[in-house]
């Protein structure tokens, strides 16, 4: 089973337009779903994505990608 990335297009700290291409570079075969993730509190302050049903957050998008890559390489 492939990886799954989920993110919210309404949270203030997450820019879906720039994050999706970066996630595709991490794993081009992953499923990407966009919609409310009920993660509004942290989503106001940090860029986040759910990776295989686990939340990953960071102050910036670039830091988020580094954390996601580390999580997938475990």
From Swiss-Prot:
Tell me which InterPro entries the record gives.
DUF1450, UPF0741
Span of the signal peptide: none
In this record, what's one Pfam family?
DUF1450
User: What is stated as this protein's family in its record?
Assistant: Belongs to the UPF0741 family.
Stored HAMAP family? UPF0741
Q: What is this protein called?
A: UPF0741 protein BCAH187_A5562
């Amino acid at each position: 089973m492939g990886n799954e990335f989920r993110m919210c297009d309404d949270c203030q700290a997450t820019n879906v337009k720039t994050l999706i291409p970066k996630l595709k570079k991490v794993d081009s075969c992953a499923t990407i779903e966009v919609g409310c993730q009920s993660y509004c509190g942290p989503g106001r302050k940090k860029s986040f994505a759910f990776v295989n049903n686990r939340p990953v957050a960071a102050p910036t998008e670039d830091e988020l990608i580094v954390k996601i890559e580390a999580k997938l390489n475990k």
